[in-house]
Amino acid sequence: MQQLNPSEISEIIKKRIENLDVSSDAQNEGTIVSVADGIVLIHGLADVMYGEMIEFPGGVYGIALNLERDSVGAVVLGKYQDLVEGQKVKCTGRILEVPIGPELLGRVVDALGNPIDGKGAINAKLTDKVEKVAPGVIERQSVDQPIQTGYKAIDAMVPIGRGQRELIIGDRQIGKTALAIDTIIAQKDSGIKCVYVAIGQKQSTIANVVRKLEEAGAMEYTTVVAAGASDPAAMLYIAPYTGCTMGEYFRDRGEDALIIYDDLTKQAWAYRQISLLLRRPPGREAYPGDVFYLHSRLLERASRVNVDYVEKFTNGEVKGKTGSLTALPIIETQGGDVSAFVPTNVISITDGQIFLETSSFNAGIRPAMNAGISVSRVGGAAQTKIVKKLGGGIRLALAQYRELAAFAQFASDLDEATRKQLEHGKQVTELMKQKQFSPMSVADMGVVLYAANDGFLEDVETSKIGSFETALLSYMNSEHTDLMADINKTGNFNGEIEATFKAAIEKFKATQTW
């Protein structure tokens, strides 16, 4: 055994003392003063940013929302029941970020981007901030490319363009979610990536939506962000921003994306709850003063960005492409009251609204859209040529029918022209009905709208309109396959196509096979 002499021992001790790290590791720490309903009051955090992530004991995180002179109000993202007064908390120096990228397609995640579908970890290469500033005026481009919803009533009367914000508004249980899900399914061959944000919904409802998307083969280009009814209010508040950040990944790289917020009423309720617990002064309907900004800063992020923006963002990797993020926010009204605080706010922020009404839904008209109140402020420029040319007469026919139907209730005898107009309105109303999960192609819409506009429905009984439409489309797709494929590709409509349509429909009507 080797012996150490005293001088060597002293040298080793000297070296150990010299190499000892005595520098202090400064950490910004505070103490929990109170915990209540997911809101934590912290004393002693000196340098904390607004929106900064705060680390609590047990690996739970929160966001600093109230910065006061001697305390910080934070909202907990997760389980707060284990937090106790007197525990130490730390600042992280980071703003909340979530995973982004194509790896999220086909997955169901929570409001923080954690997978909740049991399919394993998401190996996303990138993360991005949840709260971001919307593109500026110079970076935007006007909307001139269409997004097909697959609903003839909407694509003809309330067209939606890529980069638009179109509100879907109506009472509960009248098909708002169904309309949004069908729009996602209709994007199958368009290359548009979709994000569906479920806010405050039942877990069974979210599971049903995911199942429907999987059955339709739509999950492969869709990400579902789920903040269920049993999740903390903070998750419901943050979920739309998380989904928006995931959608912006595609927009900023010269691709097109669609995001659905289902629904923003519940996000406003969650934010109201958080604000009241943080003791912020309540305003109209007990909402805080910045509830307009809550939705405006979210919806302004949906936009169409120009070629320069995409080129600059990708450092020249993507050239000559514009990107877009189209938003379909959903707002739930109570008793059809669109003049309530949150509905009026969102109507003023968006580029139009699709108003669904209970009376139409109960009468069997689905989608239950009110053609008079529903409007698209910018989508007209994006409409496909064939639908734009043939769809104009539909809105007029429905508007006149609505007016005359109200008048006809009180009039006993009507002249022939009025009776004809009423009958035509009835037929168009019947024609605009469409089953769920059956989106229509542009060519199919063109055929149906042409038949309605050019009087081919006059001698068809109203009760047989549905079977007439099905048989006509089946005939057109089998007898004129190339023409229908060409219309789907180009969206064109000219004299030659019109003549073909006319001859084909006349030939079909002669068969009487419907």
Swiss-Prot record:
ATP binds at G170, D171, R172, Q173, I174, G175, K176, T177. It is found in: Cell inner membrane. It comes from the Bacteria. Its main location: membrane. The keyword Transcription does not apply. The keyword Secreted does not apply. It is a peripheral membrane protein. GO terms for molecular function: ADP binding; ATP binding; proton-transporting ATP synthase activity, rotational mechanism. GO terms for cellular component: plasma membrane; proton-transporting ATP synthase complex. The record marks S374 as: Required for activity. Keywords: ATP synthesis, ATP-binding, Cell inner membrane, Cell membrane, CF(1), Hydrogen ion transport, Ion transport, Membrane, Nucleotide-binding, Translocase, Transport. It is an enzyme of class 7 (translocase). It catalyses: ATP + H2O + 4 H(+)(in) = ADP + phosphate + 5 H(+)(out). Its EC number is 7.1.2.2. InterPro entries: ATP_synth_asu-like_sf, ATP_synth_asu_C, ATP_synth_asu_C_sf, ATP_synth_F1_a_nt-bd_dom, ATP_synth_F1_asu, ATPase_F1/V1/A1_a/bsu_N, ATPase_F1/V1/A1_a/bsu_N_sf, ATPase_F1/V1/A1_a/bsu_nucl-bd. Produces ATP from ADP in the presence of a proton gradient across the membrane. The alpha chain is a regulatory subunit. NCBIfam families: atpA, PRK13343.1. HAMAP family: ATP_synth_alpha_bact. Belongs to the ATPase alpha/beta chains family. F-type ATPases have 2 components, CF(1) - the catalytic core - and CF(0) - the membrane proton channel. CF(1) has five subunits: alpha(3), beta(3), gamma(1), delta(1), epsilon(1). CF(0) has three main subunits: a(1), b(2) and c(9-12). The alpha and beta chains form an alternating ring which encloses part of the gamma chain. CF(1) is attached to CF(0) by a central stalk formed by the gamma and epsilon chains, while a peripheral stalk is formed by the delta and b chains. This is ATP synthase subunit alpha 2. It comes from Marinomonas sp. (strain MWYL1). The lineage of its organism: Bacteria, Pseudomonadati, Pseudomonadota, Gammaproteobacteria, Oceanospirillales.
